UniProtKB/Swiss-Prot annotation:
It comes from the Eukaryota. Residues 1493-1505 have a biased composition (Basic and acidic residues). Pfam families: ABC2_membrane, ABC_tran, ABC_trans_N, PDR_CDR. Induction: Expression is induced in the presence of fluconazole (FLC). Disruption phenotype: Does not affect the susceptibility to azoles, but displays slightly lower minimum inhibitory concentrations (MICs) to cycloheximide and higher MICs to rhodamine 6G (R-6G). Causes further increase in susceptibility toward fluconazole and itraconazole, when AFR1 and MDR1 are also deleted. GO terms for molecular function: ABC-type transporter activity; ATP binding; ATP hydrolysis activity. ATP binds at residues 881-888. Disulfide bonds: none annotated. The gene is AFR2. This is ABC multidrug transporter AFR2. It is found in: Cell membrane.
Length: 1529
């Protein structure tokens, strides 16, 4: 039923009325979501007007009967503006739903799904490798994995244990439990997403007569799982995204007799209306890097897309994440209506479930560490546990109460039940199974199974209904709705939509390739049709074929970027992954054709390649065919691998092998027998051979150089001279092209079209692999949350538990350690914390008339409007407001963290201006938990303590303080745990505690700012965080904290509240009061409706001021505040604080400074707490540690350098000193340079990781200087560069045999040492060049593209493909600028200079001397002038002459001279130093905020203005907008 899911969001149904016995059908016209970030396209006033109109409409329609303004009963034929028009304000969702349901019934019975499960168990397989991988222990991991594989030692890990339940069609189930309890696994199991997890054999599931195997296979799209992450194509509009989903599941014969496209468009419009995103129809979806709709709107796009899948059984995993509680309630009410009218069954996991949302559900399942402790009606759950002996506080919501039962620190037994209530998950599960409710459930399951036997009547009805919707051309058991051709067509249209939406990459590549063609064409401009162009023509065709072949290498990255989306759509049964693969390849063909024409046309005619129509079109044919072959090859690699790392590693070596064995760098005759097969399997080799044949076959080339020639040989005729080129015949002034390629390359004309056929075969083979792998190989299986420790530091509690099934490193849920209460109890320091160690604070921070203005699209916008307030020691102040009110922006302004716009107003510490040290004396806990993933918890805290506490405090004292904070935050049990990444490392709560700890160990002397500390956490964790903050304030900490719609219990923990309306306007600042009484009284006396008993004051307050969805207030609350006596009191208090504290502060400051030395006073008010030298040592050690603990980075370097060295070394094994041997040695150096790009791609992501952490958290808190950041990252690469140099030296230098060339002049050691130094300079240049390029660029990908372009330029102009003397005059400067010029000269001269040349048989030139002369007599003058040697000087016929006798002659052809070796070495140091200086300069120019230092601290705060340079405004604004809620998508 492709339309059924639309009902998920239709209308707003009030479940509480039905529960109380009121008639069914209380509906508003649509679901109104208040967005996290309002749309950038609408000014604030427009948003407010829209909210007011929506509220008015809601009030009109919320009554027992719905007023119908259009008598039409055809859901698809309606008048514009009627109540069936999705774009009308009168749209009546309930009426539309009823009519749609009736229309569907005329086409046959609607499909419905429910399920029962008995003894449901789910398991995975894990291993014991739960220690941190480092460069040192990674080999041990490999050995252990091999042992496990051979011995099949993987442990079975039980995730879910013996669960039972039943969900009828049209029922809603809420799944409650803390992270790690099994909620996600349960939903995935129901929906059939069993990637890496397995059903126990004893499990029994019945989907109304359908077996699990069938629901996971042929009915895959009928039960879907929607994850909490939002994955979409960022450059498609919302309309395009949802249209695609609607068309993919549109039935074969839509109701109403309309076409499938009309049906899909109508369904899209309805869904957008229902979810309140109609205004985003033509707005791109966006993501974290591409600006599009806001985060809340993107979440609704995800929900709408899943709704359009039309599944009768839907599983939603924390889909309300990113929505505030009011919008979460709206989402659940929409699901309720969907269930009641369309019969859709849904199972929903919610971490923070408001009571109103909970009331929408029929049933609840409570999970506790993989055990089911309740399943039944939502109305029965609370009483069940109360009867068991637990106490539910009056102000605690039912879902919070149920979740709290899984936390030993939160659950409370009723009086008289101490010691009688269960305490472990197993005891809870046992009590549940002994209860009457459990017996009732078993009876319901038995009744369900009797009613719906497997493959019974309901199964046949379901099958017939599904088949009626499917295309006629589908096989009977296909889960898809469209035929395969229809799927390809749909994906193809989407592909071209994506191309039109973002043509930048395509156009950039076209332009870049055109520029490259111009550059290469100008380097080889107008080649003469003589033998002097032979080498150049070969080099040109070699480079041209490589450009055609490797232009598709980026497709690996592109495919991985969309892989998650394709797999999601496959789970929804939108299309076969292979259909998208076909469409993706077809979408790229126009670009490939254009690129082939633009690049090859320019190159071909600029360089004077064979100007014949047939030759030109054959050149184009081979180039395009090879492009397609290589595209399929790279796509096959991407689809065969499960992760990007797995794909890139073999791709790098494959590229090297393909280039090496093309036939130019090593010709066929010189390929070693054991490596010849690589040439046979190399598609590029066949293309290169055909192009060489195409260029040289049947052509005669004028000889440009004869032997002998010059003075004394003017009369040489006939066979007395010969052209100095392979294939020449004595006496002939021309050389046959066929003879040249036959002798030099062993290429033959008969292979020309054969090779084309082989390329077609390669194309078909790789295409088949690509499509097959895409269809059957999914991305890497996910692992659950586990804690990772350095080897040898795993806590005994974890080691003990690892012998059992729980807590595996592969535990999909991972709650057995990371979130499990039993384990948590054993390893945490609960009840031992001493919060008294927190530094007592005495300073009062106050602000008055704070205004913040910025420019958006050249229009001024006020973000904060005359905000007043203060934070006193020992108080916890909440900062709340509607979405877009500027809460985070106010924190940033107060903490001196904004670097753009204009800030005015007073911000005082004890009545005095903030000084330069203000930022490092305050703690700022950001919403994002950013930490270096390789550090342990203790190391992260020590790093902060060392650099941010005063330098006068000893290291020992700092470390002792860290230990105290670990105990205070109850982190000592996992102090040695590695931060890791989400899933493999700290869980959400542990990360939040670490974020707070990093700021606490800095001993903030003034106050602590926290931005949304409970965001994304479950209710239990949120409560723990608030209790921690409360504990801190009780010991003197001053805290200002933003929070988004807290529960009533959380809200009561705050002392004061600063509430902002949209536009940064103050609505209230004052005490909250016991039971929120003071706050409630203020609003009630100023016109708000009375707060009902038991209502959450935070939610009531939002509704009172008109900020909740669908609500509106006639009171101007900002103006009310301005005119209130409370504000007058606030202003008076601010004046008093400034007067009294200012005087005290001045006196205290003088006394304190009097007792200190001048140096101590200077240090106290310095920008950084530690001196630069100390910063450098500490930061350098951390960067080094990061590298050591990222074995994938270092071992990838080792693998690349060693395998490339061995590959090149043995491909040119024992290269001789013949002319071909010398050319091989030249190309062995050239090929070694090709690893430059891969090394760069390895360095840049690590640098960006460090930089992100530094810029977002460490720089604003003044932890250390940006200069130290750059230098430490550069210096840390030096040891690894030295190690890689040693590896390359031994794997490359000795196999090729360079050392043998130094034996004649007894310089083996000197030249060997020089070669090692040059290798090190190559690697040092690579490291510093990489950091210089990425220093000022946002992403590693962009920097990598720029680096590759510059690298290509350096390679083209280094003198190998075209010598400096042969370059056009215009490009000579590039030859001089390229650092590779000096690397090639230095390395090659040191490698082969000053030794003899020994020609091979085919390199000798044969001619006859004049009658009566010997060969030696005839050639003596020529040899004296030009060099070379004769085989037999006394011969009188058939003189065999080698045109070179010394390797220096060969080197001179490339303008390489051994005498320049030390000059070149010195110049390379100049390049390295330049890179370092440029890296520092570029970073300062591009990324260091300007004018944020002394000027800000010294200027009077009431006139302070800061305007950022124009070039950084937009980027910085985007950063602020994502965190501040002050801007819109």
């Amino acid at each position: 039923m492709a339309f059924a899911g639309v009902g998920q969001g239709i209308g707003t149904y009030d479940r509480t009325e039905q529960a109380s016995g009121a008639p069914l059908g209380r509906v508003t016209s649509r679901a109104h979501f208040t967005d996290i970030h309002p749309s950038d396209d609408l000014p604030a006033q427009t948003e407010e007007n829209r909210a007011r109109e929506v509220g008015h409409l809601a009030r009109q329609l919320t009554r027992q009967s719905v007023t119908v303004t259009d008598d039409s009963t055809d859901v698809f034929s309606y008048q514009e503006g009627s109540d069936l028009d999705p774009f009308s304000d009168k749209f009546n969702a309930k009426k539309w739903t009823k009519l749609m349901f009736e229309a569907v019934q005329t086409c046959g019975p609607a499909r419905k799904a429910g399920l029962s499960f008995r003894n449901l168990g789910v398991h995975g397989f894990g291993s014991d490798a739960d220690y941190q991988k480092t460069v040192g222990n990674l080999p041990l991991v490999g050995i252990g994995s091999l042992r496990d594989l051979i011995g099949n030692r993987k442990r079975k890990v039980q995730i879910l244990n013996s669960m039972d339940g039943v969900l009828e069609a049209g029922e809603m189930l809420v799944v409650l439990g803390p992270p790690g309890s099994g909620c996600t696994t349960m939903l995935k199991t129901i929906a059939g997403e069993m990637n890496g997890i397995y059903l126990d054999e004893s499990s029994s599931l019945n989907y109304r007569g359908i077996t699990p195997k069938e629901i996971y296979g042929q009915f895959r799209g009928e039960a879907i799982y929607t994850a909490e992450v939002d994955i979409h194509f960022p450059n498609l509009t919302v309309g395009q995204t949802l249209s695609f989903a609607a068309e993919a599941r549109a039935p074969r014969n839509p109701p109403g007799g309309i076409s499938k496209k009309e049906y899909a468009k109508h369904m899209r419009d309805v869904v957008m209306s229902v979810f309140g995103i109609s205004h985003t129809l033509n707005t791109i979806v966006g993501n974290d890097f591409v600006r599009g709709v806001s985060g809340g709107e993107r979440k609704r796009v995800t929900i709408a897309e899943a709704s359009l899948a039309g599944a009768p059984l839907q599983c939603w995993d924390n889909s309300t994440r990113g929505l505030d509680s009011a919008n979460a309630i709206e989402f659940c009410k929409n699901l309720r209506l969907n269930a009641d009218y369309m019969g859709i069954s849904s199972a929903v996991a919610i971490y923070q479930a408001p009571q109103s949302a909970y009331d929408c559900f029929d049933k609840v399942s409570v999970l506790y560490e993989g055990e089911q402790i309740f399943f039944g009606k939502t109305t029965d759950a609370k009483q069940f546990f109360v009867d068991m002996g637990f106490h539910c506080p009056s102000q605690q919501t039912v879902p919070d109460f149920l979740t709290s039962l899984t936390s030993p620190s939160e659950r409370r037994p009723r009086e008289g039940f101490e010691g009688k209530v269960p305490t472990t998950p197993q005891e809870f599960a046992a009590r549940w199974k002994q209860s009457d409710k459990y017996q009732e459930l078993l009876a319901q399951i038995a009744e369900f199974e009797n009613k719906y036997p497997v493959h019974g009547e309901k199964y046949r009805e379901f099958l017939e209904s599904r088949r009626a919707q499917q295309s006629k051309h589908l096989r009977s058991k296909s889960p898809y709705t469209l035929s395969y051709g229809g799927q390809v067509e749909l994906c193809l249209r989407r592909g071209f939509d994506r191309l039109r939406a973002d043509p930048s990459l395509t156009l950039t590549q076209l332009f870049g390739n055109f520029i490259m063609a111009l550059i290469i064409g100008s380097v080889f401009y107008n080649l003469p049709v003589t033998t002097s162009s032979f080498y150049s023509r070969g080099a040109l065709l070699f480079f041209a074929i490589l450009m055609s072949a490797f232009g598709s290498a980026l497709e690996i990255l592109i495919l991985y970027a969309q892989r998650g989306i394709v797999e999601k759509h496959s789970r929804y049964a939108f299309y076969h992954p292979s259909a998208e693969a076909v469409a993706s390849a077809l979408t790229d063909i126009p670009y490939k054709v254009m690129n082939c024409i633009i690049f090859n046309l320019t190159l071909y005619f600029m360089t004077n390649l064979r100007r014949e129509p047939g030759a030109y079109f054959f050149f184009m044919l081979i180039s395009f065919t090879l492009t397609m072959v290589m595209s399929m090859l790279f796509r096959s690699i991407a689809s065969l691998s499960r992760s990007l790392t797995q794909a890139l590693a073999p791709a790098a070596l494959l590229i090297l092998g393909l280039v090496m064995y093309t036939g130019f760098a090593v010709n066929v005759a010189n390929m070693r027998g054991w490596a010849r097969w690589m040439n046979w399997l190399d598609p590029i080799a066949y293309g290169f051979e055909s192009l060489m044949i195409n260029e040289f076959h049947g052509r005669e080339y004028e000889c440009s150089t004869f032997v002998p020639m010059g003075p004394g040989y003017e009369d040489a005729t006939g066979q007395q001279h010969v052209c100095s080129t392979a294939g020449a015949v004595a006496g002939s002034s021309v050389v046959n092209g066929d003879a040249y390629i036959n002798l030099s390359y062993e290429y033959y004309h008969a292979h020309k079209w054969r090779n084309f056929g082989i390329l077609i075969g390669f194309f078909l083979f790789f295409t088949a692999i690509y499509l097959t792998a895409t269809e059957f190989i999914t991305a890497k299986k996910s692992k659950g949350e586990i804690l990772v420790f350095p080897r040898g530091k795993i806590p005994h509690a974890l080691l003990a538990q690892s012998t059992h099934s729980h807590g595996s490193s592969d535990d999909v849920e991972g709650g057995k350690f990371a979130g499990g209460s039993n384990m948590k109890k054993e390893i945490t320091g609960a009840d031992r914390a001493n919060a008294g160690i927190i530094q007592k604070q005495t300073a009062i921070f106050s602000w008055k008339d704070v205004v913040y203005d910025i420019k958006i699209k050249k229009e001024p916008r006020r973000i904060l409007d005359h905000v007043d307030g203060w934070v006193k020691p020992g108080t916890l102040t909440a900062l709340m407001g509607v979405s877009g009110a500027g809460k985070t922006t106010l924190l940033d302004v107060l903490a001196t963290r904004v670097t753009m716009g204009v800030v005015t107003g007073e911000m005082l510490v004890d009545g005095k201006q903030r000084d330069l040290s203000f930022q490092r004396k305050t703690g700022y806990v950001q919403q994002q938990d950013l930490h270096l993933e390789t550090s342990t918890v203790r190391e992260a805290l020590r790093f902060s303590a060392i650099l941010r506490q005063p330098n006068t405090v000893s290291i020992k004292e700092k470390y002792e303080y860290v230990e105290e904070v670990l105990k205070l935050l109850e982190m000592d049990g996992y102090a040695d745990a590695v931060v890791g990444v989400p899933g493999t490392g700290l869980n959400v709560e542990q990360r939040k505690r670490l974020t707070i700890g990093v700021e606490l160990v800095a001993k903030p002397a003034l106050l602590l700012f926290l931005d949304e500390p409970t965001s994304g956490l479950d209710s239990q964790t949120s409560w723990n965080i608030l209790l921690l903050l409360r504990k801190l304030t009780e010991h003197g900490q001053a805290i200002l904290c933003t929070i988004h719609q807290p529960s009533a219990m959380l809200f009561e923990q705050f002392d004061r509240l600063l509430f902002l309306a949209r536009g940064g306007k103050t609505v209230y600042f004052g005490e909250v009061g016991k039971g929120s009484r003071i706050l409630i009284d203020y609003f009630e006396k100023n016109g708000a409706s009375k707060c009902p008993e038991g209502e959450n004051p935070a939610e009531w307050m939002l509704a009172a001021i008109g900020a909740a969805p669908g609500s509106h207030s006639e009171v101007d609350w900002h103006q009310t505040w301005i005119n209130s006596p409370e504000r007058i009191e606030v202003r008076s208090e601010l004046a008093r604080i400034k007067e009294t504290q200012g005087g005290k502060g001045e006196a205290a400051l003088q006394n304190k400074d009097y007792e200190k030395s001048k140096a101590e006073v200077k240090a106290e008010y310095a920008e950084f707490a530690s001196p630069l030298w100390k910063q450098f040592i500490v930061v350098l050690m951390r960067v080094w540690q990061q590298h050591w603990r990222t074995p994938s980075y270092i071992w990838a370097k080792v693998a690349l350098c060693s395998l490339s060295g061995l590959f090149i070394g043995f491909s040119f094994f024992k290269a001789g000193t013949s002319q071909q041997g010398l050319q091989n040695q030249l190309f062995s150096v050239f090929m070694m340079f090709t690893i430059f790009g891969q090394l760069t791609q390895q360095i840049m992501p690590n640098f960006v990781t460090q930089r992100s952490l530094y810029e977002v958290r460490e720089r604003p808190s003044k932890t250390y200087s940006w200069k130290i950041f750059i230098l430490s990252n550069i210096v840390s690469e030096i040891p690894w560069a030295i190690l890689m140099g040693v590896i390359i030296y031994f794997t490359w230098y000795y196999p090729i045999g360079y050392y043998r060339n130094a034996i004649p002049e007894d310089a083996v050691h000197l030249r060997g040492a020089l070669m090692f130094l040059y290798i090190e300079m190559f690697l040092l240049f690579n490291a510093t060049f990489s950091i210089m390029i990425v220093a000022g660029i946002a992403t590693a990908e962009t920097a990598g593209n720029i680096a590759n372009l510059l690298f290509s330029m350096c390679l083209i102009f280094c003198g190998v493909l075209a010598s400096g003397s042969s370059l056009p005059g215009f490009w000579v400067f590039m030859y001089r600028v390229s650092p590779f010029t000096y690397l090639v000269e230095g390395m090659l001269s040191v490698a082969v200079a000053n030794t003899d040349v020994v020609c091979s048989d085919i390199e000798f030139l044969t001619f006859n001397p004049p009658s009566g002369q010997s060969c030696g007599d005839y050639m003596s003058t020529f040899i004296t002038n030009y060099g070379g040697y004769l085989v037999d000087e006394n011969a009188t016929t058939a003189c065999e002459f080698c045109s070179m006798s010394k390797t220096n002659t060969f080197l001179a052809q490339f303008d390489i001279y051994y005498s320049n070796k030390w000059r070149d070495f010195g110049l390379l140091w100049v390049y390295v130093v330049f890179n370092v200086i440029a890296a520092i300069g570029i970073y300062w120019l591009a990324r260091v905020p300007k004018n944020t230092g002394k000027e800000r601290a010294s200027e009077p705060e009431d006139v302070q203005e800061k305007q950022v340079p124009a070039q950084s405004t937009e980027k910085k604004y985007q950063s602020i907008s994502r965190s501040s809620e002050s801007t819109v998508a």
